From Swiss-Prot:
Disulfide bonds join 120-203. Its main location: membrane. This is Bombesin receptor subtype-3. Residues 1-38 are annotated as: Disordered. The lineage of its organism: Eukaryota, Metazoa, Chordata, Craniata, Vertebrata. One of its GO terms (cellular component) is plasma membrane. Residues 64-82, 144-163, 242-272, 334-399 are cytoplasmic. Interacts with C6orf89. The chain crosses the membrane at residues 42-63, 83-103, 122-143, 164-184, 221-241, 273-293, 314-333. Belongs to the G-protein coupled receptor 1 family. It is a multi-pass membrane protein. The gene is BRS3. It comes from Ovis aries (Sheep). It holds the Pfam family 7tm_1. Keywords: Cell membrane, Disulfide bond, G-protein coupled receptor, Glycoprotein, Lipoprotein, Membrane, Palmitate, Receptor, Transducer, Transmembrane, Transmembrane helix.
Amino acid sequence: MSQRQPQSPNQTLISTTNDTESSSSVVPNDSTNKRRTGDNSPGIEALCAIYITYAVIISVGILGNAILIKVFFKTKSMQTVPNIFITSLAFGDLLLLLTCVPVDVTHYLAEGWLFGRIGCKVLSFIRLTSVGVSVFTLTILSADRYKAVVKPLERQPPNAILKTCAKAGCIWIMSMIIALPEAIFSNVYTFQDPDKNVTFKACASYPVSERLLQEIHSLLCFLVFYIIPLSIISVYYSLIARTLYKSTLNIPTEEQRHARKQIESRKRIAKTVLVLVALFALCWLPNHLLYLYRSFTSQTYMDSSTVHLFVTIISRILAFSNSCVNPFALYWLSNTFQQHFKAQLFCCKAGRPDPTAANTPLDNLAVMGRVPGAASTQMSEISVSPFTGCSVKKEDDRV
């Protein structure tokens, strides 16, 4: 394919091609880490480390999310309102791990975009849809947990499961609608680094020359997929923590042993939620800051410095890692899921669930998944945190 030459030595060449495509900027396309950049490209040792890291993320993430989904569908007691959202989150993570993460590895293997114009648009759509499903599901989960804390005695209607499935479906539809413009405008562009006199193709949402569009796009991504949902989640869980703390002050020390254990459990859960919020912010903040940096700094040429390359790799690994940690956070925090996980992983009979799980005190509805249509004293063992899709422990578990 013929390429136009730059008009001046310092001008970046950008030309739309017919056989390449763009990637979602929520996980910015890495156009600077190719081996073509010469001296600042990763060495053999670094490339091996990158390949191994990606392989671990893909294999561990697929295994964990697949088991989580299987446990949900095979275990009736796990089919609670919060676990529907968790399973939806697992589907979104699995979609990302099966498509976009393997494609991202090719940035370090090939000299340019390999998947054509259609592939670029499809992958951009999938990537942004998955990110939207994750972020918006976590936000809805935070609202669900807040409601459970404020109204622990409220009985869920018999059609709660159906309504929750509808909500999860709406999240997917909304995420796809938001991702649609990304797929429409994404394309493959040819870039030139005038300092090294090399050209390469990359999938991008907008041409580098469209400075204003990049700035608007990066700000919108930062607000819609990070600042706004994280702010909402932070408000909900600040209120949850405050409610849990105040409730512990109102229970006399002479209460029965069971109530005292419940108080300690609620304190541990409040602390765990704060940690999960920090983990969520940590995984996504570098990625968004990197895209903002690329959009608002000089773009007359691609930054191929070693520091920029290192930050890019780390930010992408952190973002993709968020899709594989949820099942293992759930394994760590939920004794019942741990038993089912082991049963599926090692093909053995799952251990008998803790009988106290079906008779948990009403106060623990704040962090327990209530069984729709059941008496108010009946509830499932699983409870969730919205940031990793993981369950919070039963009162006899330890955080």
